């Protein structure tokens, strides 16, 4: 299972460098169709894979599918809701939260009916193909003509400013914050004497869903996205510090909700929206760049956490909290830099 998950990440890293530019050059529809076809192949391939090697190959295809849909969905939402692109992008995260909430119930229904585990994959494959038909026939928002875009590109030169690089790197730090917590909170809770750490996950999911709705409302009322990218990591840092110093089971429950809210509640999506401001005609590329940073975080930070777990013994969970705090603080500094230099 771990190898298949790793293959999904590999597929993303392989395809993200060109999925965004392809989306910008040939349109969001094509990127979406490629993503749908790859996802359908992934679901059916995993369901009927005769060996681990075949499953691994289809998992790479699944990672490719994910990157192409990323560079279709996020830019399209921002282009449909031009007055509230960040709010639109936040609701892509809300859709993910909703599916994560429903999936365990669907698995339970399949299990209670004594159906094969393949049922979930087959149903998902059919559902994504239906989505593909909708992508194929429904209208997409109009974009600038290629000639005008080319002229704009020549005029601006599309130079990547230091502020743009900082915005991209927030994809790394914001992903690290919630991934470290998500993968390491169970061990921390057990070390603090919690009998049932699984409760943390429920509060984490609740915090994430709450954050998306609340943040969307705050932004509509005038809160700037860049201020969210400063405030939410600051809240996460304070919460991580409390989890470090207060060695009691209840703090893990509080931390689950707060990190779900401030760490996973759309910060990555707002990083995409902020980066897209530096690439107004290349939102697909902007999405790719942030997601590449996120994918690198997924591999490097979790590998480092695994090493700490291996050598740290009983102190490892709290050492990982320190790592998480350090990375999250770097994210705050990056956001402050973007705020100060975004118009230069």
Label each region the model flagged.
Residues 15-27, 211-224, 309:
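Helix-to-loop junctions at the C-terminal end of transmembrane segments
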Residues 225-270:
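C-terminal transmembrane helical hairpin of 12-TM major facilitator-type secondary transporters
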Residues 13-50:
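Conserved MFS/SLC helix-loop-helix module at the cytosolic interface between two early adjacent transmembrane helices
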Residues 58-94:
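Cytoplasmic helix-loop-helix junction between adjacent transmembrane helices
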Residues 68-81, 265-279:
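Intracellular juxtamembrane helix-capping segments at the cytosolic ends
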Residues 125-148, 331-339:
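C-terminal membrane-cytosol helix-exit motif in multi-pass small-molecule transporters
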Residues 160-210:
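Extracytoplasmic gate region of multi-pass secondary transporters
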């Amino acid at each position: 299972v771990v190898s298949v998950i790793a293959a999904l990440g590999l597929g993303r890293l392989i395809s993200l460098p060109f999925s965004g530019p392809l989306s910008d050059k040939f349109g969001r529809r094509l990127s979406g169709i490629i993503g749908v076809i790859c996802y359908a192949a992934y679901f059916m391939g995993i369901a009927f894979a005769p060996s681990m090697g075949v499953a691994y190959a289809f998992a790479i295809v699944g990672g490719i599918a994910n990157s192409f849909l990323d560079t279709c969905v996020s830019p399209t939402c921002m282009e449909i809701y031009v007055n509230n692109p960040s709010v639109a992008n936040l609701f892509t995260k809300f859709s993910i939260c909703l599916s994560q909430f429903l999936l365990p119930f669907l698995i339970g229904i399949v299990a209670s009916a004594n159906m094969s585990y393949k049922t979930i994959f087959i149903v998902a494959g059919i559902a994504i193909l239906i989505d593909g038909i909708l992508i194929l026939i429904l209208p997409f928002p109009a974009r600038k003509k290629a000639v005008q875009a080319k002229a704009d590109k020549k005029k601006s030169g599309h130079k990547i400013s230091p502020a743009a690089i900082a915005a991209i790197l927030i994809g790394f730090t914001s992903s690290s914050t919630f991934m470290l917590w998500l993968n390491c909170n169970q061990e921390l809770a057990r070390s603090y004497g919690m009998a049932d750490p699984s409760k943390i996950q429920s509060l984490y999911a609740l915090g994430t869903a709450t954050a998306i709705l609340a943040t969307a409302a705050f932004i509509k009322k005038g809160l700037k996205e860049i201020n969210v990218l400063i405030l939410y990591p600051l809240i996460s840092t304070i919460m991580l510090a409390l989890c470090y110093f207060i060695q009691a089971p209840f703090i893990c429950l509080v931390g689950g909700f707060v990190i779900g809210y401030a760490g996973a509640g759309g910060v990555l999506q707002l990083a995409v929206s902020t980066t897209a401001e530096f690439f107004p005609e290349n939102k697909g590329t902007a999405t790719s760049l942030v997601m590449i940073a996120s994918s690198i975080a997924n591999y490097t930070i979790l590998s480092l956490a695994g090493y700490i777990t291996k050598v740290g013994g009983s102190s490892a969970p709290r050492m990982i909290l320190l790592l998480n705090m350090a990375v999250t603080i770097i994210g705050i500094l990056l956001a402050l830099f973007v705020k100060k230099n975004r118009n230069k």
